[in-house]
Amino acid sequence: MTSPRARAAAGVSVADLGAYQQAVRRVLTCDLITKERPRPGVLDQVLRWADEMARDFRELLGYTLIATTHHVRLVRHLDVLDETQRSIFSRKGKPFDRRRLAYLCLVLGSFQRSRIEISLADLVRIFTPLANAIDGLGFDPAIGSHKAALVDVLGWLVDRGALRLSDGSLEWWARDTERGDALYDIDHDICAVLFKPARPVQHLTSAAGLVHEPPHSNPARRARRLLVEFPVVYYADVEPEVADALRAPGLAEDLVRFTGLVLERRAEGVMLADPGGVFTDRPFPGRGNAVSRAAGLLLAKIADLLEDPEHVPEPLPVPALADDQAGLVARMDAGLPRDGVVAELAWSPSEAEPPSPDDRPAPAQAPFVSRSRLETMTTELYDEFGAASFTSAWQQDPRGLLDAVIGFLSDLTLLRPVPGGVLVLPAALRYRNIRAALPTRTSGGQLALVALPEPTAQQDTPGQQDSSGQQGSSGQQDPSGQHGSSGQEVSFTQEEGR
């Protein structure tokens, strides 16, 4: 006889459940919580529930919660690679390029455990030969782009408390590398938890080694992870056993009680919806930058096109998630250095047999919208609202804005870029009546894109930090105000209650 399944938040009273769920959302959406980050007071709120959360994260998701009196860090154990997580490495809203990512790894590797402080001059002396030993990288403080990259990396570490400035100034050094200097205290405990890969990266022969578990182990846990980490999970994207787990009521009850979010079931898949729209690293719809707001307007135009009786949509197969994963691993492996890998310690992927066609779900189909049609829609938006409405960054670059919008909506699993255009995924049509990116006229008569007022139903705002404060789900806000499921698996293309 099997023992009964442990309930999420089993030791939390009804009166305290909201505070517990808020702490869970904080941990999921902030890569590192310290006394100052994301703001003072949050660490104490989270530490109150550390023991209970550690148990629930371990049993529900297989994650490890590291909690001390100084910081809280959730260590995820991945069974799928997610390229949307790149936004965790950014500075002032700008994502790190490969140079900055490489510099970050080299700087962290330069900190000796025996040293509790380091001057910027000493750090540069240690770091420079390491960077120059790597073909195509290098570091020269006389080159502005190199110096700017190092400044961003050190600022990123300061933001997380890994370094604390005790004397001098980084800005002074950036202006004058000969005379400027800074002295930093090193927090080795935080440095140690910032990067905890599944295996030592110097012994990997493939990026597949960054995944902790094979894809077919523990379908229920994989289903929970997909729901927490991705905006929407489509049944056609996952193995049949994972789809069955997603349909199981026990899984939904656990996650709803654990996170305080609303599980929305539809014929095509499942999603965790946040009525407040704050459980996310990419606020949508209605808040955020011009890209987010333009994305809402473009979705509205796409919905108008697909619902036009004179338009006959062209359905095309949606590429399988497994193929996307294989392509991502192949791109990463193409740049993987082979020098220095110790053959006796190296990890290589097992020679697994490819799944038979019968084991793979039938590919879903989605309507195709051509690139030329999308460009026409973008031009119409510029004509309707005026170029100035899209901020100075995009006034003269409508195609660049379109590229950014497509990437943004792709990260939210609403569009799927394919050669020649995009596929419109089912959840995109939740926003057919979008009201969060509306035009209003300024005092000068210029049309402007503005967001709806901030939601008042929930004061918890774990996603409202800089874009680097993310390691969790891209949960979406329900634009129609319909937060729950009707109990029937209607399509994303249908509105509940109709």
Each language-model region and where it sits:
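A short, conserved structural fragment
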Residues: 61-65, 154, 158-169, 258-264, ...
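Long, intrinsically disordered low-complexity tandem-repeat segments
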Residues: 458-488
